[in-house]
Amino acid sequence: MFNKQSVSLEWAGRTLTIETGQVARQADGAVMVQYGDTIVLATAVFAKEAKPGQDFFPLTVNYQEKYFASGRIPGGFFKREGRPTEKETLTSRLIDRPIRPLFVDGFKHEVQVVVTTLSYDLENDADIIALVGASAALVLSGAPFMGPIGAARVGYKDGQYIINPTIAELEESELDLVVAGTTDAVMMVESQAAELSEDVMLGAVVAGHDAMQPVIDAIIALAEKAAKEPFAYEPPDHSAALKSVIDTVGADLSKAYKITAKGERYAAIGAAKDKAKAALLGTDEAPGVMTPEVFKTVFKEAEASVVRGDILKTGQRIDGRKLDQIRPIVAEAGFLPRTHGSSLFTRGETQAICVATLGTSDDEQYIDGLDGTKKEKFMLHYNFPPYSVGETGRMGGAGRREIGHGKLAWRALKAVLPKHEDFPYTIRMVSEITESNGSSSMATVCGCSLAMMDAGVPLTRPVSGIAMGLILEGSEFAVLSDILGDEDHLGDMDFKVAGTENGVTSLQMDIKVAGITKDIMGKALEQAKGGRMHILGEMGKALTASRGQLSENAPQMEIIKVPTDKIRDVIGSGGKVIRGIVDETGAKVNIDDDGTVQISAMDRKSIDAAIKMIKGITAEAEVGEIYEGKVVSMKDFGIFVNFFGPKDGLVHVSQMANKRIGHPKEMVKEGDKVWVKLMGFDERGKVRLSMKVVDQETGKELAEEAGDDASED
């Protein structure tokens, strides 16, 4: 019934198996990939005809994690998987980015790749084999995909690279880098690092590319056994149409792309487009030399050809800058008066308002995944409204792009955050992109770094970021610093680098063409370093380090420790004691299982009051010490006094006074304040108190002899 085919190899100490022919046989391509006990199912399906009028490549990648993969049941009312999690969205993007450029130019048939995690061993993350599976499924499907690609994760510890580190090894690693590529080219890099040098980062990319080669060979071997016949697709030849457009408006486009202001430039490009349409499309009565669909495609190609050629010939950019020149920067801290920390970061026509908000442990984000529920103390949310590019559009929840850009900035800043024990606040960053013309994610890095310093978050060092680009034609190339949006679209590489003066904290690279060598990547990294240092200098005009104190608008906080055996005393039966502390002081109190108590309030007085009450509860009463207490109940044989936090003790009637009394009510009533001395504990551990040895006016101890004589009456 099944025609199973598989390949296996030992890869970084574990067995990788890719199998096809048993599951999802109606998909054009389907593989099961296993690494350790982590298993994914990857499928690829493509439409055999393009939709009429389709003018872009409709590739969709969906990565999904099933809770059953790790033996868990989803939370919530419906108890089933819901909208994509951040992890699923980021992994979908991770798969999309290296495979998209490898489809044949002009292919506009709908393609859908679905990768599902079916088993998760809590050691091997599924994202790497998800990439491998997507690549294998596409190769087997017969789609015009110029793969396969491989992928690998690289860690770094004690000066050594670690290929495909486990989850536990990643926690100790200074680097988490994912690289994907073909046999001879790197296509995508995504990373988070602990201020590592450019050489170490480049070495990690090379190490990962070398490590994935056996996987690429395995996919090719499987394809030789099980691949479908290649889909008959002939890329359209638009060379004559392209030449017609360039001959007609090439000079106009070259002139338009030298205009610095984005709005004026787009107006000039629009005029050139209208001129070309009039000359080449003709009318209904007299058709022109090409169809509107072909014109739309080749006009974009003409733009790219003109811009790329001008940059390589003249060494000058679209807006007149030199290759390594950064746009003018204006950085301002404390931009908004009532926020905890804020900044306005403007670089050319890209601008971000970044805001820091500090909260308590109550504000931590709970993240539910295959490995359980985790709490995150640092959040960064990136918003890209349509007005930032002068357009109208849908306003709603964060899309894939916004989630991806936010996570890139999150990775860039994570390395410089203070340890939680030194700064126990939950931090939420928000970046509102108010203008965009390239590199808004790196503006977010710079702006959020300033906003956190403005809020008083003690970052180890400021972080800046820069987006690099590349124009590559044969052996000629130009590396561009601080690229514009147009340079991103028309270029061959989008290379984002963020870091401090000490090293790189995040690196993201997307390459659209083969042929980018290690030397070119090295030059781009080195040029990016110079740009980052320049940007740090401009940021330093606003703030060079965190402010010495927190914003007056932020909550104040203090952490204390209590013995673990005292936690139940602080909480009380049904939370009665801790609620009483909160109600009486106005402070928020959170206590962890290890005895860490987080106390926060808007004023210091409330915090001090809460600390005093907690210490009163957890401190140990000492025999022989004198305490002030309150009468809480009266019996015939004596009174019970609350004298040390929640502690009550008995003052026997014989210990109330240096004279004989018949009933406690002759001396006190409930609610009276009295002074007592802790005499000790009885055989059952009950507290024994005495009033008669203490002067009830002053709280001073009376002479022992007087007390002893009176007790013998």
From Swiss-Prot:
Catalytic activity: RNA(n+1) + phosphate = RNA(n) + a ribonucleoside 5'-diphosphate
A GO biological process held by the record: RNA processing
Role noted for this protein: Involved in mRNA degradation. Catalyzes the phosphorolysis of single-stranded polyribonucleotides processively in the 3'- to 5'-direction.
Residues covered by the S1 motif domain: 624-692
Group of enzyme by EC: transferase
Protein family membership: Belongs to the polyribonucleotide nucleotidyltransferase family.
The keyword Nucleotidyltransferase belongs to this UniProt entry's keyword annotation: yes
PANTHER family: POLYRIBONUCLEOTIDE NUCLEOTIDYLTRANSFERASE, POLYRIBONUCLEOTIDE NUCLEOTIDYLTRANSFERASE 1, MITOCHONDRIAL
Cofactor: Mg(2+)
HAMAP family registered for this protein in UniProt: PNPase
Keywords from the UniProt entry: Cytoplasm, Magnesium, Metal-binding, Nucleotidyltransferase, RNA-binding, Transferase
Organism: Hyphomonas neptunium (strain ATCC 15444)
Protein name: Polyribonucleotide nucleotidyltransferase
Compartments where located: Cytoplasm
Listed Pfam families: KH_1, PNPase, RNase_PH, RNase_PH_C, S1
